[in-house]
């Protein structure tokens, strides 16, 4: 990274969202891990002069409307918002409405919450646990989309 910065490249580092707003025990454990991770990212960004994108500075990132149903990754809207945040942080043209808060999430009836959670356990939780036990990654065997460095024109 230092070599990249010395070469004149613009380097941006990203913090992860520490607090999703969830009140579960797992969310508390992840929050502690993410806080430690982000402390290192912030330190390195400061040391090397990298641009830092930290979603923890804005409460709008905590909205569940940005998260894929796997509860781990961003969905299309979340990726769009991150892209706009990157452009804004780089002082490039961007959609100025990217910070506009989403409407409050709809509170599902208890039966729907249970159904949604069971679906998540079957589709994502159990497969994740099996991969962990087998010491496999969901990315094992996948080829990169861009196997060689690629220049992107603005």
Regions found by a protein language model. Give the residues of each.
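A short helix->loop->beta-strand "cap" motif at the edges of active sites that frequently abuts
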Residues: 5-11, 50
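Alpha/beta-hydrolase-fold catalytic nucleophile elbow
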Residues: 14-15
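The feature captures the short pre-catalytic strand/loop hairpin that immediately precedes
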Residues: 59-69
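Conserved catalytic region of serine esterases and O-acyltransferases that act on ester linkages
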Residues: 47, 70-73, 77-154
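Surface-exposed alpha-helical segments enriched in charged/polar residues
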Residues: 2, 39-43, 88
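Short alpha-helix in the Rossmann-fold core of NAD(P)-dependent oxidoreductases
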Residues: 1-4, 75
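Oxyanion-hole/transition-state-stabilizing segment in secreted/luminal serine hydrolases
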Residues: 18-19, 125
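Substrate-gating cap/lid alpha-helix
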Residues: 19-55, 76
């Amino acid at each position: 990274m230092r070599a990249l910065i010395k070469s004149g490249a613009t380097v941006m580092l990203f913090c992860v969202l520490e607090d999703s707003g969830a009140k579960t025990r797992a969310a508390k454990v992840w929050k502690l891990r993410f806080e430690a991770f982000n402390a290192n990212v912030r330190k390195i960004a400061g040391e090397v002069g990298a641009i830092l994108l930290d979603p923890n500075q804005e409460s709008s990132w905590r909205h569940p409307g940005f998260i894929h149903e796997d509860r781990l990754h961003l969905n299309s809207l979340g990726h769009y918002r991150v892209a706009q945040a990157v452009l804004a942080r780089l002082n490039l043209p961007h959609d100025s409405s990217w910070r506009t808060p989403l409407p409050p999430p709809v509170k599902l009836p208890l039966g729907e919450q249970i159904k949604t959670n069971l679906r998540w356990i079957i589709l994502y939780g159990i497969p994740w646990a099996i991969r962990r036990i087998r010491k496999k990654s969901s990315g094992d065997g996948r080829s990169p989309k861009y196997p060689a460095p690629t220049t992107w024109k603005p």
